[in-house]
Amino acid sequence: MGKEKLHVNVVVIGHVDSGKSTTTGHLIYKCGGIDKRTIEKFEKEAAELGKGSFKYAWVLDKLKAERERGITIDIALWKFETPKYMVTVIDAPGHRDFIKNMITGTSQADCAILTIAGGTGEFEAGISKDGQTREHALLAFTLGVRQLIVAVNKMDTTKWSEDRFNEIVKETSTFIKKVGYNPKTVAFVPISGWHGDNMLEESTNMPWYKGWTKETKAGVVKGKTLLDAIDAIEPPVRPSDKPLRLPLQDVYKIGGIGTVPVGRVETGIIKAGMVVTFAPSNVTTEVKSVEMHHEQLAEGKPGDNVGFNVKNVSVKDIRRGNVASDSKNDPAKEAASFNAQVIVLNHPGQIGAGYAPVLDCHTAHIACKFAELLEKIDRRTGKSLEASPKFVKSGDACIVKLVPSKPMCVESYNEYPPLGRFAVRDMRQTVAVGIIKSVDKTDKSGGKVTKSAEKAAKKK
């Protein structure tokens, strides 16, 4: 066994028919954690249902269905390897909830793979003004996903045309530039997710294709395939040296064990013996044990989905959306209000002070009031365009003071990125995204401190 590979996370974005599932399925299938038996089982089922031509996407559909039914699916199924990395596919979107998931969940995305359908008409549909492609790319950029790979898919339907590929690269470059990406740092790969061209091996169908190049801090990087491009992702820096922040996804009551909050460590580490404070509930208690995938862990690090056992805390005290933090190291607090840079994506009317949509920030889902529009700014440069605007509309960016309707814990994006970005939901869709600039925290004394926390403090 060599040294464990570095983990990176990718999010696959693009229009619903761009072939994301097939492309992702193909990678997982060929370099992934799905064992041969499962593959054969899936293939047999797909063939019986006459879905033979759909096998890679079928693999993904099966995994999704199992994931949605809450079968704790072996997470290896969503992983594949490159020479350098162990890659986890966070979400292959195509659904309304994707945007929400992306904001609340992509703290972890190190790179976005934008899949674009090369077929005539398809590309245009995906990139049209209201296209999902645009929205996904804008989101990825706004949420700090700075690395991008563009996979121009379905090249087989263009008869492997070099002209079509070049045309798409040109259009897409203009498009991603508007979003904020620098096309020179992006690898453009012509592929067929279904036939496998330029996925792992160089395609013989496109002799004109000489490979991709991209600029990085270290210099120019070159490669041929999509796998090469993923392998050329710049390694992420994980925030384990920051204070602990762990937003709770759920809180379980487990007979014989007690209360077990579950969530992903976003920053810092969590380990047994630590005294944690939950905000905004303002409850402090000792962590008895930490586990992941039903195994005890010495410590949970950023990116780990963990369950941890806490004593003397009832399921009523803490809930989804609460944030666990180290009581001795910058403990999390309730936000009385916060200022954020908000980008309006798609709202049919105007938004003014008093607007009170639901914010999805990390795992919290709480209505917040736009108390004050402070200034309208240029989305790309951040320069002020207008002080105290009366209204903002789609396409605008502004600095807003927000006041939560219920106790909520958020942080500034600079200090704790995953807790500093949010989606604004209204009319069953994401109408805006935001990045938190500053938080006005309430200092509540007299929170509940459990006996086990007091004992742990005495031991120290």
UniProtKB/Swiss-Prot annotation:
Subcellular location(s) per record: Cytoplasm
Domain tr-type G: 5-240
Region (G3): 91-94
Keyword Transmembrane included in the entry's annotation: no
GO MF term set: GTP binding; GTPase activity; translation elongation factor activity
UniProt-listed PANTHER family: TRANSLATION FACTOR
Protein name as annotated: Elongation factor 1-alpha
